[in-house]
Amino acid sequence: MSEWKKVKIGDFLTEREGRYKSDDSKISKYKRLDKIDFSGTIHISDKPTKTDMIIVHPGDLVISGINVAKGAVAVYQGDEPVCATIHYSSYTLDSSKVDLVYFKYFVKSPEFIAALQKQVKGGIKTEIKPKHLLPLEISIPDLQTQQEIVKKISLQLKKTEQLSVEIESQKNYIKQLRQNILQEAIEGKLTADWRKQNPVQKGNPDYDAEALFEQIQKERNNEKKQKELSPITDEEKTFEIPEGWKWVRLGEICKKITDGTHKTPKYTNSGIKFVSAKDIYNKELDFSHCKYISESEHKELYKRCNPELNDLLISKSGSIGTVVLNNVTFEFSLFESLALIKYTQSELVPKFMKFAVQYICNNLTISDIKGVCVKHLHLNVLSGQTLGLPPLAEQKEIVNKVETLLTKVKTLENQITEREQLTKQLMQSILKGYV
């Protein structure tokens, strides 16, 4: 049975010293270590920085001071040195005392986290520098036992990695399944059997989209004279719509398509909520971290852009094309990164509109997104998008079908998430059981 003994990490790990200004000629020829991801992969970059630098040599153990507790540790395997910001530290290791792979596993183990929490002020919330790492006391077995442990861990982790690959494949399948459901709904395939039982009734908006469209136009023109959009070409009709449906442009069935203020308001500590694309989380509006503006400024902004219950909000920048159905009754204001779509809710079912606009956004092409450095979805592009408009009764049936299917998909998704969490726990338990 091997004997475990307490040692300081500094007994076998030595910091590679040297600190350089970012414009120092000694490092000008080197590429830069951009980041170490949580899987331990090193990413190299040519991006400049003004932060002070260190030099990392081939074979060095490199640790991210900010993310070491999340697994950002790696051995640099390049052929020539690179530089890294001082948020990283580089070490040589005495291989007669500690196996390098064993120590990498140890740094990713619960025991290492526990040592940080116990021996370093601030624990894992502190940026871990050599002065924190090297004095840490840990327990390790003899070198031969370390190498035996590495073999066992590697074998077990290989199995969990295979599980992770399977889970990632299942997650991609779920994503594709959601898109397929949406596509079949918006193309009328989900409600093919329903239409057999509910044939077209000319002049009835519930069962005739042409009549529904005429009704929508009356409502829109009663409120404001609407700008005419160009006729829809055959090339824009991307699928064959069912009998009783009608090809329309989004701008033809909406009362308003606008966006939030383009001028940054004066923020306050409280008042009226002011949201941007950053406040969309999991395809829902999340007000928990939003900004606030005064009531007087809100009233001025609300005259042009007035989100109300069941209006649609669409992210115009960042994660472009995420669609949210507003489910709150209180007033709030928008920044320019969010578009607002208002429509007549008596003629268009809110959840159907969300599905339809999300389908449109999913199929936007690169040419639809404007901008060189910062990409944006322009309102005129959104307004000109085409969709097949179903009669009112069929819109309701589409919503029922989609929600039933998405509930089943959500159940599958929860099962995959549970498997993913169990796999992560398994990886941690493997490390805990050996190191």
Predicted regions: what they are:
Residues 4-52, 65, 70, 232-233, ...:
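Low-complexity, Lys/Gly-biased intrinsically disordered segments
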